[in-house]
Regions:
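Nucleotide and nucleotide-moiety/phosphate-recognizing core
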Residues: 2-106, 115-130, 137-142, 149, ...
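Glycine-rich phosphate-binding loop at the start of an alpha helix
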Residues: 112
Length: 202
């Protein structure tokens, strides 16, 4: 079984915020698969589907972002998921332009509290992850107020595009492997100004 976890905060007030783009990505995957993510299980909302030949559990932890690891640990244990091979975590990245994604097979949390909670709970950095860029158009307007505020109307088209891109990338990871997905999507989304050293870490 593959476990796809989107990170975010529960509650309607956070529903369409940059910090919840992981939840939105899981919802988009579910929509494309024709399923709902509405079963409460292991401190998360979950839904089952198939992608290719794989059984997939979609999950949105309800523990709030900073305690996401509690739910992910429970899901991994209860479904006997290999956390290093069969878990994919999707979350927001304030340092990436809105509309871009980055896929990594492993690494630190880079300061993201939700990802750090998962690393702590699983006791490994060997966790596949996909970061979705949510940076504001004006860098001076970033920070907590921005990521916990609603997306602006001018951003919605790009949000829609990146959610479709995330769903495509998940399909590639599951069906063709993470190396193929990294090669295809990281290069496709690479900003011209990004230096080569940084690109090799992704």
């Amino acid at each position: 079984m593959k476990l796809i976890v989107g990170l975010g905060n529960p509650g309607i007030e956070y529903q369409f915020t940059p910090h919840n783009i992981g939840f939105l990505a899981v919802d988009r995957i579910a929509e494309q698969c024709g399923v709902m993510v509405d079963n409460r299980h292991a401190k998360a909302l979950t839904g089952r589907t198939r992608i290719g030949n794989e059984e997939v559990l979609l999950a949105k932890p309800e523990t709030y972002m900073n305690h996401s690891g509690m739910s992910v640990r429970d899901l991994v244990d209860k479904h006997e998921v290999n956390a290093e091979k069969d878990l994919i975590v999707i979350y927001d990245e304030l340092d990436l332009p809105l509309g871009m994604i980055r896929i990594r097979a492993r690494g630190s949390s880079a300061g993201h509290n939700g990802m750090q909670s998962i690393i702590n709970a699983l006791q490994t950095e060997e966790v596949q992850r996909m970061r979705l860029g949510v940076a504001p158009d004006d860098p001076a307007k970033g920070g907590a107020r921005y990521i916990l505020g609603q997306f602006r109307k001018s951003q919605l088209a790009r949000v829609d595009e990146v959610l479709d891109l995330a769903a495509q990338a998940v399909n590639v990871i599951i069906n063709e492997g993470i190396a193929t997905a990294m090669n295809r999507f990281n290069r496709k989304n690479k900003p011209e100004e990004e230096d080569k050293d940084n690109a090799t870490k992704l």
